[in-house]
């Protein structure tokens, strides 16, 4: 049995905390310069780390809330609640910021596709574009939320192209590439608070938006549009005066198997996406010891899927773990693992290292920093490395021999894991962590 009232209170409480440091209008100065937003806490030194994890450099970004990441070549695209940054990591010991695009709109989930960048906005804005955009309520005339599209062909001077409105905004989004060079975008949406519930965000909701992007250049970015709003049913997330909502937080796709793993807050789901415009739920995944189904990732052999719980579990509680299931028989978990230290556990955003024969998961863990877990034996997970910055890391991913983390208040950290566990890992031309496009034997 799920705990919808508990999930609802946690989601709203977490949003309230983060909103305290969200930037307001898009502007050239930081939002706390005018006293409207309190400054973030100062950067903190490492609280603890394993001997096989090394911090190489930091591209600081003190301001607002830093969120998710995407990668292309030597560039990292780092979302934040006031826009996004582009950072050059060609010299890992000296990460260099190339651009910081100010375009208000939490929460800044980001992906890249050729010359294009897509940015999620799930708080109603006063305007679709960047200039003068500020947080408003869903009932404000002209309020907009959805996905913004940018041309990043010149990483030092990104250009806003258009804003695609989606019902209930875009909390996160996931690319689903096509063989014709275009991509679909799955947009996961739900109301973060009562002020976000507008006429197009009504209970039970039960759907995602699908955007069609016909290519990967400027012309395709301008032509992108919503082409479907398929229904996805499950266990209600919110139960209250505003009605019973069902929605998904994050969607992971494994395109070679036409699979998706949807972390839908009140349950996990597996989808058949052989028809990408009409995904079909094939399995419901649940356990009473998961409170907020937040993220998912497939192993690179396609045999297992790992879900993360965003509950902020205290050391004595079962919550906040990662849970691993067999894709072909997900009725019961193979294992779960909490942060194996005396501190709160929350596995937040993560991916698997692309290495054949081993399943190594790299994850952010909020206040517990970055955690690296060996799941080669899915029944016996073991943390093999960690780096705790005594702050809060939103996203951590493996990318081309590096571990890259976006810390909520500090900015981007570049780390390296020493040892043989990841030897032979595949190098990638680009990475949108929620999109897995290949299998390894």
Tell where the protein language model's regions lie, with residue ranges:
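Feature marking well-ordered beta-strand scaffolds used for ligand recognition
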Residues: 14-22, 27-441
